[in-house]
Amino acid sequence: MSFYQPSLSLYDVLNALSNQTGQRGQQGYPRQPQRPQRYHPHYGQVHVGGHHPRHHPLYSRYNGVPNTYYYQFPGQAYYYSPEYGYDDEDGEEEDQDEDMVGDSGTTRQEDGGEDSNSRRYPSYYHCNTARNNRTNQQANSLNDLLTALIGVPPYEGTEPEIEANTEQEGEKGEEKDKKDKSEAPKEEAGETNKEKPLNQLEESSRPPLAKKSSSFAHLQAPSPIPDPLQVSKPETRMDLPFSPEVNVYDTEDTYVVVLALPGANSRAFHIDYHPSSHEMLIKGKIEDRVGIDEKFLKITELKYGAFERTVKFPVLPRIKDEEIKATYNNGLLQIKVPKIVNDTEKPKPKKRIAIEEIPDEELEFEENPNPTVEN
């Protein structure tokens, strides 16, 4: 059996290419990214600010939980992973794209106004880049608010208005003075005269800055240098003991460690102090005493089961490990660790160790190969 294979000429190839280009032209150009307050043809309505449909990539960014449901965490310098126990395989959050942060700041400000300016998005304790992106987003939203109060439309700077005013002032100056002057000095003079009232309006319309209340007074920026007083990093894995919330107080004569353990029993706690590593390990187990079957459970935020947390103290001042005391009351486990403030103990004197001389059997045999044995 033979098959016939037709031969293609150059004309046939060119004709096929022209047909493909014609079909692409009928489909139209690819859709360009739309700016806020623009009509999206594939949505059928105008989307302003943060109102995006569920399949939009920015939907989850504006429909999350407000930051009022979150509390602040210490910086990275206060967390460490203890060497003993289990390994910490806590994954870090991925860095967000800077372009997405910039777009979200502008769209959120145009929609919410003052409400969106007061709302802040949560930033997680193990993600420094998210904290930096949040500050950039707040700065962009503040600029958009100022432009909205002044009356300048979005996505348009103040340069076109300044240039138009400078041209009018230049024409008036030419008619009055009737002198040949270059346009550059007039534009510079007009810009300086116009920027002053704009700056005054921005300063007058700028809202007062609110002070951020924080339970960590000296935490202003993350420091790469570890703090001498540290706690173990909170565990997020479900197959390992959970980490209860902890507060550590450093007073003049004692360290006070407070852990939140509601619904627990003091007999289920185990507190161990390791003098060699200056670490205190608190572990135990919390039992579910509600008495309702888990099949009726719909929302769960309470933690039950095994827990574990470690506190690492500085080397100095030293700690009186024999006087450590712990109390459990109202769901709070309070541990007081006293310090040795005035160390009056004298250092022990140096002790020289004498080396004992042991005779060498081989040398003795060489000196006396035939020893005489006495009867």
Swiss-Prot record:
State the GO CC annotations.
cytoplasm
Regions annotated as coiled coil: none
Please, one GO biological process term? cytoskeleton organization
Q: What induces it?
A: By stress such as heat shock or increased salt concentration. Up-regulated by all stress conditions tested. Also expressed in unstressed cells.
Q: Basic and acidic residues bias located where?
A: 169-197
Keyword ATP-binding among record annotations: no
| Low complexity composition bias: residue spans | 22-48
PROSITE patterns associated with the record: SHSP
In terms of superkingdom, the source organism counts as Eukaryota
Task: List, alphabetically, the InterPro entries matched.
Answer: A-crystallin/Hsp20_dom (IPR002068), HSP20-like_chaperone (IPR008978)
Pfam family membership, one: HSP20
Question: Where in the sequence does UniProt note compositional bias of the Basic residues kind?
Answer: 49-58
Where in the sequence does UniProt note compositional bias of the Acidic residues kind? 85-101, 158-168, 357-367
Summarize subunit and interaction data from the UniProt record for this chain: Forms oligomeric complexes. Interacts with itself.
Also noted in the record is: Present with 1470 molecules/cell in log phase SD medium.
What is the protein named?
Heat shock protein 42
What gene name is listed for this protein? HSP42
